[in-house]
């Protein structure tokens, strides 16, 4: 345990308290939407998914331990993280199917059901890619599994299949909806953009999964934000995709009970890649790329910090092989950690930032 972890923590920095506040915030937002937004029925799928996810995770964690699915911590990471070594990983394998199965039952309307099945398919595909990556890491006892090129190829293939189905069915609007009644017509460019967002978002959520409860809490908030803006757009909203968002939000809230500090389980690439894929698929089908960009600002910042760090280091690298570093360590949460901010303080701050971005995304949501 690091020095910063042993110092007195503010009440909101305690893992159980901050996680409880986050869960209450999401449920309050859902209940408010059901009361005041026409056609909104978000709380039931949220509650059901949270309860089932919590039960499945609670039963599955001992099994992960028995299978010796212990996380390998990279040596070059923050020294305080070495105590996390051996914590069960691949937790996404327990809870992602919960969200997918419950989400697929949200509606019986034929076209909406087909869309939800497509979202479920690409989410499960990314879960399997992440699971294979995690499994390779565990069997090799290293922090790296698949090669970056191999993982990128598999992610691209899964995204391409989803986009091909969406193109065939005519599900995706070629203009990106923006605030104030504006839109950005892209024509055929929407397809390479869609592929890029799949790769960028899934890897951004993956990079965010570096502190106890960080990705699961932020993910639950962003899914909730997407659901709320979907119900606020148009005359009757989009209950099917909004309901699917809430099952995913509930899934990650249930997981958060065990993933909060000190974590009893990690989601691994199994969960983080699936989270990013589900967010992207829903955003593409509902013309919500702009809300996803705003609400997922923490994911974006984490990803950009890595890109900037690598680019500057390579651009300034001298004959001795050393270059400049913009951040103490990337992703961004490690920069703050090495600056002396404890994990238990940092994670609630990132959750709060995400909640603020969700509110901003709702205020700047597209209409119609």
From Swiss-Prot:
Its cofactor is Mg(2+). It is found in: Cell inner membrane. Belongs to the glycosyltransferase 4 family. MraY subfamily. This is Phospho-N-acetylmuramoyl-pentapeptide-transferase. It is an enzyme of class 2 (transferase). GO terms for biological process: cell division; cell wall organization; peptidoglycan biosynthetic process; regulation of cell shape. It comes from the Bacteria. The chain crosses the membrane at residues 11-31, 42-62, 86-106, 112-132, 152-172, 180-200, 211-231, 239-259, 265-285, 293-313, 347-367. GO terms for cellular component: plasma membrane. Catalyzes the initial step of the lipid cycle reactions in the biosynthesis of the cell wall peptidoglycan: transfers peptidoglycan precursor phospho-MurNAc-pentapeptide from UDP-MurNAc-pentapeptide onto the lipid carrier undecaprenyl phosphate, yielding undecaprenyl-pyrophosphoryl-MurNAc-pentapeptide, known as lipid I. Pfam families: Glycos_transf_4, MraY_sig1. It comes from Synechococcus sp. (strain CC9902). It is a multi-pass membrane protein. Its EC number is 2.7.8.13. InterPro entries: Glycosyl_transferase_4, PNAcMuramoyl-5peptid_Trfase, PNAcMuramoyl-5peptid_Trfase_CS. It catalyses: UDP-N-acetyl-alpha-D-muramoyl-L-alanyl-gamma-D-glutamyl-meso-2,6-diaminopimeloyl-D-alanyl-D-alanine + di-trans,octa-cis-undecaprenyl phosphate = di-trans,octa-cis-undecaprenyl diphospho-N-acetyl-alpha-D-muramoyl-L-alanyl-D-glutamyl-meso-2,6-diaminopimeloyl-D-alanyl-D-alanine + UMP. Pathway: Cell wall biogenesis; peptidoglycan biosynthesis. Keywords: Cell cycle, Cell division, Cell inner membrane, Cell membrane, Cell shape, Cell wall biogenesis/degradation, Magnesium, Membrane, Metal-binding, Peptidoglycan synthesis, Transferase, Transmembrane, Transmembrane helix. One of its GO terms (molecular function) is UDP-N-acetylmuramoyl-L-alanyl-D-glutamyl-meso-2,6-diaminopimelyl-D-alanyl-D-alanine:undecaprenyl-phosphate transferase activity.
């Amino acid at each position: 345990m690091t020095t910063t972890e042993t110092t007195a923590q503010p009440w909101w920095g305690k893992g159980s308290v901050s996680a409880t506040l986050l869960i209450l915030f999401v449920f309050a937002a859902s209940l408010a939407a059901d009361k005041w937004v026409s056609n909104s029925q978000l709380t039931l799928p949220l509650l059901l998914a949270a309860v089932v996810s919590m039960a499945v995770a609670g039963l599955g964690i001992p099994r992960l331990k028995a299978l010796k699915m212990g996380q390998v911590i990279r040596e070059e990471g923050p020294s305080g993280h070495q105590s996390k070594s051996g914590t069960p990983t691949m937790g996404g394998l327990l809870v992602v199917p919960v969200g997918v199965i419950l989400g697929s039952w949200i509606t019986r309307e034929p076209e909406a059901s087909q869309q939800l099945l497509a979202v479920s398919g690409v989410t499960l595909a990314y879960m399997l890619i992440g699971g294979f990556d995690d499994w390779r890491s565990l069997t090799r006892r290293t922090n790296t599994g698949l090669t970056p090129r191999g993982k990128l190829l598999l992610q691209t293939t899964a995204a391409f299949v989803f986009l091909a189905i969406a193109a065939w069915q005519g599900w995706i609007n070629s203009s990106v909806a923006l605030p104030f009644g504006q839109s950005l017509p892209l024509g055929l460019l929407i397809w390479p953009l869609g592929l890029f967002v799949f790769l960028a978002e899934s890897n951004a959520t993956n990079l965010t999964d570096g502190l106890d409860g960080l990705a699961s809490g932020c993910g639950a908030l962003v899914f909730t934000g997407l659901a709320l803006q979907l119900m606020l757009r148009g005359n009757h909203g989009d209950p099917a995709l909004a309901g699917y968002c809430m099952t995913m939000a509930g899934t990650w809230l249930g997981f958060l009970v065990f993933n909060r500090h000190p974590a009893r389980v990690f989601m691994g690439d199994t969960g983080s890649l699936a989270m990013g894929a589900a967010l992207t698929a829903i955003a593409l089908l509902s013309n919500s790329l702009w809300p996803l960009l705003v609400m997922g600002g923490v994911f974006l910042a984490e990803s950009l910090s890595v890109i900037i760090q690598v680019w500057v280091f390579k651009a300034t690298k001298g004959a001795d092989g050393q270059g400049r570093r913009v951040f103490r360590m990337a992703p961004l949460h490690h920069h703050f950690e090495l600056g002396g901010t404890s994990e238990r303080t940092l994670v609630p701050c990132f959750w709060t930032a995400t909640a603020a971005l969700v509110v901003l995304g709702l205020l700047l949501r597209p209409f119609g």
